[in-house]
């Protein structure tokens, strides 16, 4: 059999031209868009970190105020101890009551301010993280990402065990899979195969597309639901940020309790 060198070199040239076109008009714009998004997210995270530092600075200032108040209270108590007899006891008790009332009012005021500031910062962080993440999802949404989400949900079903079995046994309504994007036949078949191979389910399965499920997939039947979504990962970040903001408040309460015992 003769080897056609002209055909060989023509096909090689066509392949090189195709590689160049893909790199020039497809891969480069996508990579540039991803880099731009990453830079934007980094900037937003820096802003959030700056807000956290400001909150920590405010907490340190409040702690300094409490220390000064403790020092003033200690001076008042020391003066009262120098008084003689019943007058000394009366003045000491009066000073202690005034101190406790003032301390309580100031502590309540500081806690309210701290809680309000924490809620404001946490709300801004949550809103910005969800906004940026939602924007990234929208900009990167394509069939490849959707296929990955379908595979991730199938993995979630495989690991569901008893939870999935109870949902399949609940009955009463058709088994429905809701998603924020139109699933292709390959993704649908993957979910059906997972239910059949793992749980022996070969019944009816309806697929529905709803905007409210953007970034997630849910399997529902009989009032039960099994979900997988990007938002669930973001909620974990939300809980971590809330715990970080609540931490200084708990430490502050502990320090105040020790200070109160020292004053007694």
Swiss-Prot record:
Residues 255-264 have a biased composition (Basic and acidic residues). GO terms for molecular function: proton-transporting ATP synthase activity, rotational mechanism; proton-transporting ATPase activity, rotational mechanism. It is a single-pass membrane protein. It is found in: Cell inner membrane. Residues 240-264 are annotated as: Disordered. One of its GO terms (cellular component) is plasma membrane. Keywords: ATP synthesis, Cell inner membrane, Cell membrane, CF(0), Hydrogen ion transport, Ion transport, Membrane, Transmembrane, Transmembrane helix, Transport. The chain crosses the membrane at residues 2-22. It holds the Pfam family OSCP. Its main location: membrane. InterPro entries: Alt_ATP_synth_F0_bsu, ATP_synth_b/b'su_bac/chlpt, ATP_synth_F0_bsu_bac, ATP_synthase_B_chain, ATPase_OSCP/dsu. HAMAP family: ATP_synth_b_bprime. F-type ATPases have 2 components, F(1) - the catalytic core - and F(0) - the membrane proton channel. F(1) has five subunits: alpha(3), beta(3), gamma(1), delta(1), epsilon(1). F(0) has four main subunits: a(1), b(2) and c(10-14). The alpha and beta chains form an alternating ring which encloses part of the gamma chain. F(1) is attached to F(0) by a central stalk formed by the gamma and epsilon chains, while a peripheral stalk is formed by the delta and b chains. F(1)F(0) ATP synthase produces ATP from ADP in the presence of a proton or sodium gradient. F-type ATPases consist of two structural domains, F(1) containing the extramembraneous catalytic core and F(0) containing the membrane proton channel, linked together by a central stalk and a peripheral stalk. During catalysis, ATP synthesis in the catalytic domain of F(1) is coupled via a rotary mechanism of the central stalk subunits to proton translocation. Component of the F(0) channel, it forms part of the peripheral stalk, linking F(1) to F(0). NCBIfam families: alt_F1F0_F0_B, ATP_synt_b. Belongs to the ATPase B chain family. This is ATP synthase subunit b 1. It comes from Chlorobium luteolum (strain DSM 273 / BCRC 81028 / 2530).
């Amino acid at each position: 059999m003769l080897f056609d060198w002209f055909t060989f070199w023509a096909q090689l040239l066509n392949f090189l031209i195709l590689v160049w076109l893909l790199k020039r008009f497809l891969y480069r714009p996508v990579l540039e868009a991803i880099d731009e998004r990453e830079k934007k997210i980094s900037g937003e995270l820096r802003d959030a970190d700056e807000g956290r530092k400001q909150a920590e600075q405010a907490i340190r200032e409040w702690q300094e105020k409490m220390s000064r108040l403790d020092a003033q209270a200690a001076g008042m108590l020391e003066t009262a101890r120098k008084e003689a007899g019943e007058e000394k006891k009366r003045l000491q008790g009066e000073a202690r009551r005034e101190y406790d009332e003032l301390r309580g009012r100031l502590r309540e005021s500081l806690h309210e301010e701290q809680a309000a500031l924490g809620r404001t910062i946490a709300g801004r962080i949550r809103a910005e993280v969800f906004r940026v993440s939602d924007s990234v999802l929208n900009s990167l949404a394509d069939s490849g990402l959707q296929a990955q989400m379908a595979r991730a949900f199938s993995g979630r079903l495989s690991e569901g065990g008893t939870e999935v079995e109870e949902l399949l046994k609940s009955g009463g309504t058709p088994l429905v899979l809701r998603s924020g994007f139109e699933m292709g036949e390959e993704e649908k078949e993957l979910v059906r195969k997972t239910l059949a191979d793992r749980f022996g389910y070969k019944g009816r399965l309806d697929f529905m597309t709803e905007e409210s499920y953007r970034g997630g997939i849910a399997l529902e039947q009989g009032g039960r639901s099994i979900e997988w979504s990007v938002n669930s990962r973001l909620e974990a970040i939300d809980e971590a940020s809330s715990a970080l903001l609540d931490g200084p408040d708990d430490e502050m309460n502990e320090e105040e309790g020790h200070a109160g015992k020292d004053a007694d």
